[in-house]
């Protein structure tokens, strides 16, 4: 038997018992011939002591991360030597038998949570990820992830959902983000694609009458490198038949409530909702951080007749930085550099003195009437600073949205342990293709319009008859869940009629012929009594990183990729041999399909 107990579970009531522990040498100390070892296993640490001369001689050879088994008697630590920072700190194991299960070479870095993780480069940590996972913080991250999986499953199974696996080898639909392609050896010149999401298959499951589906799904996107993105990621995927938006949101809130309970936090429900239009108007983002109460104030009408050329723009907006008037000039100059790094020309400002008098470059260039009224208009008090952005509404609001977050950080308005959730609903169904980024399953078509979420999102009922006549005004039957400024999930009521789906494709510039070639199986399925259905997908990596307080999703993935999609541990991706290339049929030309007469 390798063990009778776990190291971190030994307590005072075990005193006098003979136990066997197995684990790793976390720390070794010699004190006058007596050797002390901190033994680590998955449960934590226990102090083991080698006093017997024979086992002490054997223990003399132990080094960090040796894998060992020890048997001995649990003793109470001598008075005054207890360790209150250790769960097992009231006891020690007096060893009478030691077995070295495996030795360890010199470590590339110390496995010690007390030292700053920043002292070890991430590339090194990922190259030796199996050692990095022995650190308590990394171990606990994966345990948390497992617990979160179980909590979500429990909620869904209680509501009669079925956990169903969908294919990971499917057909490429190149209108979205780039697919990872897999050569089909038995059909030379043809390729599978790894799925960017289970979207189409879960809709087909609804057509198939499963009614309630979920899956902790692996998804793949061959995107250009962006910070804190992974080429393979996980989402909790949920789909339901015969539901409306409120039904899906209700189940989603129950899932969120269950998983946040894993860290001891009760989410107040129902979670508030705001429209996409209000999110952009007041927060400059479709994923607003509501942990602090700073709102954008529109000033376009206020400056409608201004002589100040900077404000002679389609949009003028402002935010207020409380007590910001006392900032030194170098800090105000730093704000300009900050704005320019985001593609803006700068960040105009007015300082409101303690006496209410205005100063700064903007104050000198606006009219007396504007000077008299601007502080009241934006809600600024003596001692505050008003920041402005002017230009087109989208980019100006985005700049002010970023600025409100920066102001909150500088003023210490974001408190550790604060959580703020909101649903963002009624997003546009389409956006101009020039403004789009390919993030959905079918994000880009060939026309002036592309889908904001994806091409299978239903228009809102009131837009059903007009969305293809006036795409710019159409609203989607979609809902995104936002936590602390992070979009952690998104879903929609889906299109379940083939005629509506084809109309959406047409708005996106996807012809009937192209739609039939790429999505004919879905369009055909919709003709066989497809039910109304909808669902949601949660970004599982992001959620677990938020729950655990991690800066990066890489910390909550067992074996993540580093920048550029490289795995330092296995050195993937790697070249293949000429034989593999030939056998896979990568370079073969696909056979033309025979046309039927």
From Swiss-Prot:
InterPro entries: Aa-tRNA-synt_II (IPR004364), aa-tRNA-synth_II (IPR006195), aa-tRNA-synth_II/BPL/LPL (IPR045864), Asp-tRNA-ligase_1 (IPR004524), Asp-tRNA-ligase_1_N (IPR047089), Asp/Asn-tRNA-synth_IIb (IPR002312), AspRS_core (IPR047090), GAD-like_sf (IPR004115). GO terms for molecular function: aspartate-tRNA ligase activity; aspartate-tRNA(Asn) ligase activity; ATP binding; nucleic acid binding. Residues 579-589 have a biased composition (Basic and acidic residues). PROSITE patterns: AA_TRNA_LIGASE_II (PS50862). It comes from the Bacteria. Its main location: cytoplasm. Residues 199-202 are annotated as: Aspartate. One of its GO terms (biological process) is aspartyl-tRNA aminoacylation. ATP binds at residues 221-223, 230, 487, 539-542. CDD domains: AspRS_core, EcAspRS_like_N. L-aspartate binds at residues 175, 221, 453, 494. It is an enzyme of class 6 (ligase). Its EC number is 6.1.1.23. It catalyses: tRNA(Asx) + L-aspartate + ATP = L-aspartyl-tRNA(Asx) + AMP + diphosphate. GO terms for cellular component: cytoplasm. Keywords: Aminoacyl-tRNA synthetase, ATP-binding, Cytoplasm, Ligase, Nucleotide-binding, Protein biosynthesis. It is found in: Cytoplasm. Residues 562-597 are annotated as: Disordered. The record marks 31, 80 as: Important for tRNA non-discrimination. NCBIfam families: aspS_bact, PRK00476.1. Aspartyl-tRNA synthetase with relaxed tRNA specificity since it is able to aspartylate not only its cognate tRNA(Asp) but also tRNA(Asn). Reaction proceeds in two steps: L-aspartate is first activated by ATP to form Asp-AMP and then transferred to the acceptor end of tRNA(Asp/Asn). Belongs to the class-II aminoacyl-tRNA synthetase family. Type 1 subfamily. Homodimer. This is Aspartate--tRNA(Asp/Asn) ligase. It comes from Corynebacterium kroppenstedtii (strain DSM 44385 / JCM 11950 / CIP 105744 / CCUG 35717).
